[in-house]
Curated annotation (Swiss-Prot):
Gene3D superfamilies: 1.25.40.30. InterPro entries: ARM-type_fold (IPR016024), Clathrin_H-chain_linker (IPR012331), CLHC1 (IPR017212), TSNAXIP1_N (IPR032755). The keyword Coiled coil applies. It comes from the Eukaryota. This is Clathrin heavy chain linker domain-containing protein 1. It holds the Pfam family Clathrin_H_link. Signal peptide: none annotated. Residues 118-239 form a coiled coil. It comes from Rattus norvegicus. Keywords: Coiled coil. The gene is Clhc1.
Length: 585
């Protein structure tokens, strides 16, 4: 066989084993699957391609043991080449950006130079304007100094030359006809004012003269009433005598005249018995007229109620003589009506009428009507009416009235401050100074509250403790525990803090301790030494509280101040020293 034929048969492709074929197919599937997963196209991105084929290369190296060292060297060179390519790309990108920056520098320099020229031009303009303004200011100052140094005297007539005439335009002020009309109007107004002064107003001397004249007339009236009473008594006595004589004449004078005279003398009316005189000689016409008027008011009131004229009925009740219709019965009538659709509440109309007319009477409206009226106004959301009644009407206040207003303020936070102010007025009128001070504190008016406490004599320490419990405000507690105008504080600082910690107001107590801890030691010493009500044991208890709540320095300061006092020593619990030993020896 020729040599060429032998070589031709020798280069036949080797037969691939089944395992190698499956391995190659799995690698091919892996490449396709990973390429689709990362979304690579045929042109890139290259980094994902490099990663996929690097993994395939690693698997091939692991699979082929015979060529592992050779393939590992090839892969190492392959990775080095790829890293060199990547580094070259990064350097190219960096150099490209740097090249752009270098190319843009001349343009930026030109822009900056142009902007510099513009700003310098603006600065020159501003400097010129500033110099001009400064020059004007200097000129004005010079003129003002010259004006102040020169005494200028103007005539009284020349003062009005530059002022416009009130009620006239500049054009009318130079028109003679308009000026004449304006003058005529002013003269008419002046004439009317003089007439009003003579008819509508009187001088204080005139009032004094009228008062004296009234006193004289009242004296005349008293004299005339006494004379009238005497004359009526005489008239009554003559009537009795006349009646007796007429009866005697009708009986044909069968009784002796002497007996008739005795019977006349025995009549009490002849001698003016007090009871007979009072019954017979009262002002009967006036009493009768007054009773008729009262009866008319009552009948008319019931008639208006039956007709549904509740507003008129309320006015009738308010204007009734001697307040005969301003009572609980009338209030119950209006309350029984209830609400009327499309109209104000009849009960509110009743209270509005009687409260608005209360100033016309000497006596104030009683407590029950006042309380019911305030409650009615608050239930109808008419705080404006309640405000007017409390400040202007003549009412009889009570503690329940103030409590009702405070409760309304708690239910309506928007009106709380106004309700507290009204309740304060009520409590002051009732003499309830504790509740009035609480209202001031809830309004944040702590300075006024301090003044009120200082003026009140019936407020003690327990009341102030209750006050800070009901209104735990730092400013209030600070005002109660600080000296005022050289006077000792109202409350002991130490006892106050201990009380706050005992009633679950730890936050307020912590704030007070925090403020004190920021002060100097001499201030703390003054606070401890000037506190006359807090004993040493209480201060030690307060120091322990400070230590438990993180105020170690304050606790140490308090204890050092206590130890520095003469005759004061700290005794531990384990010490067996007898405190009263010196007494028995």
């Amino acid at each position: 066989m020729p040599t060429q034929e032998v070589k031709k048969h020798a280069v036949l492709p080797p037969i691939i084993s089944r395992n190698d074929k499956e391995f190659l197919e799995s690698m091919q599937r892996y490449i396709i699957t990973e390429t689709k997963r990362v979304g690579c196209n045929e042109e890139g991105p290259p980094d994902e391609y490099y990663t996929i084929y690097r993994n395939v290369f690693d698997k091939v190296i692991d699979y082929v043991n015979a060529y592992k060292s050779v393939l590992t060297s090839i892969k190492k060179e392959y990775d080095a080449f790829i890293e060199t390519v990547k580094k070259g790309r990064r350097n190219a990108f960096y150099l490209h950006g740097k090249l752009k920056v270098l190319a843009a520098e001349p343009t930026a320099l030109v822009y900056h130079q142009r902007r510099t020229i513009q700003l310098e031009a603006k600065m020159r303009i501003i400097d010129n304007n500033s110099k001009a303004i400064q020059l004007q200011i200097d000129q004005m100052k010079q003129l003002r100094m010259e004006y102040e140094n020169t005494e200028v005297k103007l005539c009284a007539s020349s003062k009005q030359l530059w002022k416009p005439i009130p009620g006239m335009t500049l054009q009318d002020s130079v028109n003679l006809d308009a000026l004449n009309n304006h003058k005529q109007n002013l003269e008419d107004k002046c004439r009317k004012l003089k007439q009003d002064m003579s008819t509508m107003y009187v001088s204080a001397q005139k009032k004094a003269d009228l008062d004296e004249e009234m006193i004289v007339l009242l004296k005349r009236r008293d004299i005339a009433e006494n004379l009238n009473k005497d004359l009526r008594f005489r008239h009554q006595r003559l009537q009795v005598i006349s009646h007796t004589l007429n009866s005697w004449m009708k009986q044909n004078m069968r009784i002796p005249f002497k007996d008739v005279l005795e019977r006349i003398q025995q009549t009490k009316a002849i001698y003016g018995h007090a009871k007979v005189v009072d019954e017979l000689f009262e002002d009967d016409p006036n009493k009768t007229k007054e009773a008729i008027v009262m009866l008319y008011y009552i009948e008319r009131f019931h008639e208006l109620i039956s007709l549904g004229e509740y507003e008129k009925a309320a006015c009738f009740a308010a204007n009734s003589p001697k307040r005969i219709l301003q009572n609980a019965g009338t209030m119950n009538k209006f309350k029984a009506i209830g609400k009327v659709r499309g109209k104000p509440l009849p009960l509110l109309l009743f209270f509005e009428a009687i409260f608005n007319t209360s100033q016309a009477f000497k006596r104030a409206i009683n407590v029950d009507l006042t309380l019911e009226g305030i409650k009615c106004g608050l239930s109808e959301e008419r705080l404006d009416l309640v405000t007017h009644w409390v400040t202007q009407a003549k009412l009889t206040f009570s503690e329940k009235v103030g409590d009702a207003i405070c409760a309304y303020g708690e239910q309506h936070p928007y009106h709380k401050s106004k309700c507290l102010a009204l309740a304060q007025i009520v409590y002051n009128e009732c003499g309830l100074h504790k509740k009035a001070i609480l209202c001031l504190c809830r309004q944040g008016q702590f300075h006024e509250a301090m003044e009120h406490i200082q003026q009140s004599k019936d407020i003690n320490t327990d009341d102030l403790i209750q006050l800070i419990t009901a209104c735990p405000q730092i400013d209030l507690i600070r005002g109660l525990t600080e000296e005022r105008n050289g006077k000792p504080p109202f409350l002991s600082f130490g006892l106050t803090v201990l009380h706050l910690f005992s009633v679950d107001m730890k936050k307020i107590g912590m704030k007070l301790l925090q403020e004190v801890s920021k002060a100097e030691k001499d201030v703390i010493e003054h606070l401890v030494m000037s506190d006359l009500f807090c004993s040493i044991e209480k201060w030690q208890e307060l120091a322990n509280i400070c230590l438990q709540n993180g105020f170690k320095n304050l606790s140490n300061d308090i204890m050092s101040i206590l130890r520095s006092q003469a005759g004061v020593s700290e005794i531990s619990e384990d010490d067996t020293t007898n405190v009263m030993e010196h007494v028995f020896w």
